[in-house]
Amino acid sequence: MSAPVFSKISDSYAKLWAGMVVAPAHQAACDRAARAILAYKNQYVAVSKETSVPWFVIGMIDMMEAGGGCRRHLHNGDSLLHRTVNVPRGRLPAPAEPPFTWPQSAKDALAIDGLDKVKSWSVELLCYEMEKYNGFGYRAHGINSPYLWSYSNQYHAGKFVSDGVWSATAVSGQAGAMPIFKSLCTLDKTISFDGKPATPATPAPHAATEPHELTLGDLVHDVEALVSSFVKWAKAT
């Protein structure tokens, strides 16, 4: 799916972010990921100074694509011992030679995506660039990308279980970028966009979110929850 125009979907990102509530059962996982990003803040800041990309944007990409730790290609999580094998394939090109340093890879990844040319960042643009990194294919299925929203109320079910293979009932088991980012903002109050706080005010009950059409995945999720509750009740009686 081709990339949508940012200006046409930025408002929807703002609404999703403002209405996002992290699932209590997954809050600890999001906090752990955020602390892992903060553990390497100095490395992200060093690359930020050379690229003008905010350190927390670099950290988020590293966590989502490579599991954090500044130890794999920022492009896609491939090993730094050789050029990238997965898309984008063949990075870094000659005259650079492997093994590569993490800063080398990070600066190349940010440059080929044009992130070093961005003049003004916002939480909406962060959402857009993170979704672009993973792909906009979820939009064709009418759901919010789990890459962004998993572990929050903005995602329920549906995912690609392998390249091009879609399942309406599969549920992502990975924390989404935005729940992690919310934890990161809570732990590091210096994070802001052009001096404005990154985190929204606490949403009121029934905060407006993207319309969510009931899917088979939703029904399966609800049935599983009911079965789980019944089993617990049966064991207790």
Per-region residue spans from a language model:
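Non-catalytic cell-wall polysaccharide-engagement segments
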Residues: 1-18, 92-237
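Alpha-helix initiation and capping sites
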Residues: 38, 55, 99-103
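Substrate-binding/active-site groove segments that recognize
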Residues: 71-93
